[in-house]
Amino acid sequence: MLDPKLLRNALADTTRQLARRGFEWDAAAFATLEAERKEMQVCTQELQAKRNARSKIIGKAKAQGEDIAPLLAEMTELGDHLKTVEARLEVVQAQIEEILLGIPNLPDASTPPGKDEQDNVEVRRWGTPPALEFVPKDHVDLGASLGMDFETAVKLSGTRFVTLIGPLAQLHRALIQFMLDVHTREHGYTEVYVPYLANRESLVGTGQLPKFEEGLFAIRDTGYYLIPTAEVPVTNLVRGEILLAERLPLKYVAHTPCFRSEAGSYGKDTRGMIRQHQFEKVELVQIVPPEVSQQAHEDLTGHAEAILQRLGLPYRVMNLCAGDLGFASSKTYDLEVWLPGQQTYREISSCSNFLDFQARRIQARWRDPKTQKPAWVHTLNGSGLAVGRTLLALMENYQQADGSIRIPETLQPYMGGVSVLQPSIRG
């Protein structure tokens, strides 16, 4: 949530900044509601003051034995008027809150202008795409003889699901363990296990609700949703807290399944594991003091990059333009891995700095040692990495002419020493 003061005191400038990301809204309606809120608040305060004054007068009159019936009638009338004004104020505040929850974060000054992914700016590249001496297959063709089964998944659940059997399932698990080990042992993250069902308040807190409900799987008649990312429960670990300065930064890592309806993605990436209803991620979340969040963003991005580098997967880092930012993000780096089967780079991680946008929604603060007063923390998160996409990137980049897949040395200890996955015909 944006600081309401920005909208109250700098409405025109804030509206211009929101326009950078293509967001249009009824600023005039907000201004009208805000004026009414101020009027109702002043009226409420005046009526409360009058009621308090009348209460004292009634007390004195009663002590002196005077007739207080007229004063009581006036007090009742004041009380009724106050209730009416307070009820209207509550309605106006709820309308303003609804508007605020639907406004995205402001793009950072270093976020490039642009409308969509075509305007994203490349920051750097790492690695060289493999020079294969044969026509590379994509992960679907490779996986057909390695235990990647989409047809069975359709029978079990429907489209946009997959089953992995045998060595590919083991490789999938190995990637998860490898990522967790690197992040906990080398990058200083604390591993957490969280629920895979989240309540509405949690999803409002991180910004998925109320705007993106159609993209979520809701559990009917329960108030629960399947989590679209571990960002939701992990960030909400500090909801409603005032953290001591010595606890910061908090660095959490969690492996969870993620569930997304992919509403609005009809016809996109229908082949393979690129866009699934259910997929696994290892998620990085940081809760930090405001003055270090910019550096924390660079560090977190580097932590995700380290996994790709250890696996020897070529990638590039993209600074997302304002029009391509996620709802809650102020600045985002996308890591895009090279896929020989598609002859292009595809997103494998998004690393974002939300500043105090999520913190305001979840009421997460820290006690600033300089002022000894509570202040908003900054929140950041990124995938470290998306496991399914890492799996298919390994398959495509390490494929051999016979359809076998070489296992990077760094993963071989997690695979019981296996160095090559050999294709086999399933009967």
Curated annotation (Swiss-Prot):
Q: Which GO terms describe its biological process?
A: selenocysteine biosynthetic process; seryl-tRNA aminoacylation
**How does the entry describe the domains?**
Consists of two distinct domains, a catalytic core and a N-terminal extension that is involved in tRNA binding.
Q: What class of enzyme is it?
A: ligase
Task: Please tell me the species this chain comes from.
Answer: Nitrosococcus oceani (strain ATCC 19707 / BCRC 17464 / JCM 30415 / NCIMB 11848 / C-107)
Task: Say what the protein does.
Answer: Catalyzes the attachment of serine to tRNA(Ser). Is also able to aminoacylate tRNA(Sec) with serine, to form the misacylated tRNA L-seryl-tRNA(Sec), which will be further converted into selenocysteinyl-tRNA(Sec).
Q: Which family does it belong to?
A: Belongs to the class-II aminoacyl-tRNA synthetase family. Type-1 seryl-tRNA synthetase subfamily.
Q: What EC number(s) would the UniProt record show?
A: 6.1.1.11
Which pathway is recorded for this entry?
Aminoacyl-tRNA biosynthesis; selenocysteinyl-tRNA(Sec) biosynthesis; L-seryl-tRNA(Sec) from L-serine and tRNA(Sec): step 1/1
Query: Where is the protein localized?
Result: Cytoplasm
Under which name does UniProt file this protein? Serine--tRNA ligase
Question: What broad taxonomic lineage does this protein's source fall under?
Answer: Bacteria, Pseudomonadati, Pseudomonadota, Gammaproteobacteria, Chromatiales
Binding-site positions, L-serine: 229-231, 283, 383
Q: Which GO terms describe its cellular component?
A: cytoplasm
Q: Where along the chain is ATP bound?
A: 260-262, 347-350
